[in-house]
UniProtKB/Swiss-Prot annotation:
F-type ATPases have 2 components, CF(1) - the catalytic core - and CF(0) - the membrane proton channel. CF(1) has five subunits: alpha(3), beta(3), gamma(1), delta(1), epsilon(1). CF(0) has three main subunits: a(1), b(2) and c(9-12). The alpha and beta chains form an alternating ring which encloses part of the gamma chain. CF(1) is attached to CF(0) by a central stalk formed by the gamma and epsilon chains, while a peripheral stalk is formed by the delta and b chains. One of its GO terms (cellular component) is proton-transporting ATP synthase complex. It is a peripheral membrane protein. This is ATP synthase subunit beta. It holds the Pfam family ATP-synt_ab_N. Gene3D superfamilies: 2.40.10.170, Bovine Mitochondrial F1-atpase, Atp Synthase Beta Chain, Chain D, domain 3, P-loop containing nucleotide triphosphate hydrolases. PROSITE patterns: ATPASE_ALPHA_BETA (PS00152). Keywords: ATP synthesis, ATP-binding, Cell inner membrane, Cell membrane, CF(1), Hydrogen ion transport, Ion transport, Membrane, Nucleotide-binding, Translocase, Transport.
């Protein structure tokens, strides 16, 4: 084990000088003696000096402290011992339940599966959320992004998806909390505990209060744990199907931005690191399904200032199979989940994959909403009376569709007081098909707001009529 000494500390970036014949490799982990701090080598500056990122606070570090090269990259515990536990970026337990009893440890920097090992995803994954199942269906083993600005419901949507999929899905889940609120991580832990699925979830947190090194690497830690479950063959020679939840992928980029300038790189557009696309690619290419097992990932993506063309969300778009875009204008109407059905996309939107009935219904819903969007300006200036009968009918149906896209969530029960609803894909298609066919033109649009299936809307309309 070669030893070096710290020669410079600037924020989260630490320079360490080693003898020239034993300079550590890039991504080697260094341990600072008599401290808990691990450094990860990022650059070799020459003359035996390496520049590192500190995984942990650099408070209390000083020059001439000894750093020991471990000779390998950061390694974290993997396997069944991680289930039900909360760990930090280095795989150390932070739930005060004793050490993690893992059989093996893997390095967090790994190659993506080779081209011939990958397998395409076509099987649909039902979420129980109407707007998602109809307009941007998820694939089992696919990658999904939840895009939204501040406060439009990314985390609540993520929690509902976890509630609906992880609880129904008998496989394993990994949750990586990257630079988000500690409170949300705590809520997630209790949510899993209360629903008795904690023994199927591994949790890795590097939240907002952590130094940038932790936030930069915690996504890789969670991913490595998920990869182990996918790749480790059981007695039948198969890996497992794993769910990977990442909240929030933007903070991973942001942590890279924070240390990029300190590492001596020139900033690129909007001040992001010049290696933005590469860093995103390295992470995203590993989140994939192989012939062995699958990783289905759901990632929340913060959109700075609601600008989807910002380099960070724009770079993320390219890697995803489905994009769920949350809109502030829809949230302002009180329609939750605030998913924009015209802006959300899915690669599964193909009649050969989802079937003709689903595809046709989704297309007709989209056309109706698009027509309403185009007519909004005319309505704002001239009012509804100036529209043709055909246009009035389209507007009426579109407003019903908009309201029918809303749905009470299980995870929001404590706030709203109304019980959550899970709607099967079959019921979702049937309900929307009936609305665009005009079967419910006689019902008031309020009846469609915050209900589950179409039968509930009919029931609600009856109650409204009785009250009136």
């Amino acid at each position: 084990m070669s030893q070096g000494k710290i020669v410079q500390i600037i924020g989260a970036v630490v320079d360490v000088e080693f003898p020239r014949e034993s300079v550590p490799k890039v991504y080697d982990a260094l341990k600072v003696e008599n401290t808990e701090i691990t450094l990860e080598v990022q650059q070799q500056l020459g003359d035996g000096v390496v520049r590192c990122i500190a995984l942990g606070s650099t408070d209390g570090l000083k020059r001439n402290l000894v750093a020991v090269n471990t000779g390998r990259g950061i390694s974290v515990p993997v396997g069944a011992g991680t289930l039900g536990r909360i760990m930090d970026v280095l795989g150390r337990p932070i739930d005060e339940a004793g050490p993690v009893a893992a059989s093996d440890s893997w390095e967090i920097h790994r190659d993506a599966p080779s081209y011939e090992d990958q397998s395409p995803a076509t099987e649909l994954l039902e979420t129980g959320i109407k707007v998602i199942d109809l307009m941007c269906p998820f694939a089992k083993g696919g990658k999904v992004g939840l895009f939204g600005g501040a406060g439009v419901g990314k985390t609540v949507n993520m929690m509902e998806l976890i509630n609906n999929i992880a609880k129904a899905h008998s496989g394993l889940s990994v949750f990586a909390g990257v630079g988000e609120r500690t409170r949300e991580g705590n809520d997630f832990y209790h949510e899993m505990k209360d629903s008795n699925v904690l023994d199927k979830v591994a949790m890795v947190y590097g939240q907002m209060n952590e130094p940038p090194g932790n936030r930069l690497r915690v996504a890789l830690t969670g991913l490595t744990m998920a990869e182990y479950f996918r790749d480790e063959k059981d007695e039948n020679g198969k890996g497992k199907d794993v769910l990977l939840f990442v909240d929030n992928i933007y903070r991973y980029t942001l942590a890279g931005t924070e240390v990029s300038a300190l590492l001596g790189r020139m900033p690129s557009a909007v001040g992001y690191q010049p290696t933005l696309a590469e860093e995103m690619g390295v992470l995203q290419e590993r989140i994939t399904s192989t012939k062995n097992g699958s990783i289905t990932s759901i990632q929340a993506v913060y959109v700075p200032a609601d600008d989807l063309t910002d380099p960070s969300p724009a770079t993320t778009f390219a890697h995803l199979d489905s994009t769920v875009t949350l809109s502030r204008s829809i949230a302002s109407l009180g329609i939750y989940p605030a998913v924009d059905p015209l802006d959300s996309t899915s690669r599964q939107m193909d009649p050969l994959v989802i079937g003709h009935e689903h595809y046709d219904t989704a297309q007709r819903v989209q056309q109706t909403l698009q027509k309403y969007k185009e007519l909004k300006d005319i309505i704002a200036i001239l009012g509804m009376d100036e529209l043709s009968e055909e246009d009035k009918q389209a507007v009426s149906r579109a407003r019903k569709i908009e309201r029918f896209f809303s749905q009470p969530f299980h995870v929001a029960e404590v706030f709203t007081g109304s019980p959550g609803k899970y709607v099967s894909l079959k019921d979702t298609i049937r309900g929307f098909k009936a609305i665009v066919d005009g079967e419910y033109d006689h019902l008031p649009e309020q009846a469609f707001y915050m209900v589950g299936s179409i039968e509930e809307a009919v029931e609600k309309a009856k109650k409204m009529a009785e009250k009136a």
